[in-house]
Amino acid sequence: MAKKIIKSCYIWDELLMAECDRLPAVAERASRVHSLIVSYNLINKLQVVHSSPALYEDLKLFHSENYLEHLKTLQKVDDDYVIEIHDEEFGIGYDCQPVSDMYKLVSVIAGGSLAAAKSIILGIADVAINWFGGWHHAQRFCAEGFCYVNDIVICIEKLRLKFKKVLYIDLDVHHGNGVQDAYNLSNSVFTLSIHKYEPGFYPGTGSMDEVGNLTGKGYTCNVPLHESYNDETMEYVFGKVFHKIYDSFKPDTIVVQCGADALAGDPMGGGGLTIKGYCTCVKNILDKQKPTVLLGGGGYNFSNTAKLWASITALVVDVELEQNIPEHDYWPLYGPDYIISIQPLLGRDKNCKADLDNCIAKIEDNLKFVIERKTIKHKTEQNEISTCKNLKETLCKRQKKLQIKENNVLIIDESPNNDVYNFID
């Protein structure tokens, strides 16, 4: 297949970055990531798209009204705020600390991934990058694992207005349980998660035995790995599994969660990857030339996370980064070497080839359900998935109003009166 020129966009705006900087587990990480991307002049190679907060109806594509209404009550949270039982019922507490203006926070974060989906749907980009998204643990009824909103599921639901089959790939060191749970019964969204799986390691799910249920049987794939898995292991299993899933499922579009906490040196990970391991996986995905959304996720060594996501951005726009990191506001935090590469883990990879091959064989066996079954539209437990009567006709008659600004900035007008999508209850 001849190499295709990729149209790529980068979701960014001041509000989106500022809200992500407020997330307690990754405070100011968003600014560090964006600043590194800017310092390498990668912005000049990308169409910048400004997002706007998600509408209530968009958030309800996945989350329950009770959960959303509770988030609206968390308006002013200070040091004297006492977590109540009602908060804990919705997952607000230990790992998901209460934050002021919580509903605004989740609306803005979800809006970023919605902008990525709309950029793909409208043909603005073949690859949409949103490093501010990727919160894969949030459940329909509650926050979980540092994730207050499952922007990934909302993004996928928006993509399904146009694309029949969506392949979701999760590269985070933690299992993508929230997304898997959302599509456990679906045979139009295939979920693949490659992650660390050890006793006591969060979230405790993601075994090979979790393959989906009923009409979704065979459409969930987990590759559980022991700690310290390195580039060689990741590239081997991904190279084997991804192509088999792709050929069996034949997706129309792909969503990738690029959580950076599987990098060597992450304080909450336990993986042993370098930038090379991640980029090899992403390159395999991009080579399929399908419309693709790239999202962020975990990553608690903020400098390494910024290095990884800047490197993946460079891969998308076909730029080779200089090893020496350019001077910018966060440059002192990249010491003592100030280079873009990440040192591999010195410890031994605890995964053996025999176990990996056994896992791959089981995955191949499960894929027979995908090959044998025709894909049908999945309807969520919450409500009938919103659909578009005739997307093509709607796009022609009610084009999205776009404003082209200087410096390749594109603003998607999110006014309900101008929204191109007609939702049906």
Describe the role of every protein-language-model region.
Residues M1-N66, V77:
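N-terminal low-complexity, Ser/Thr- and acidic-residue-enriched intrinsically disordered segments
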Residues M1-I11, L16-M17, H70-D425:
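A general "terminal functional-core" signal
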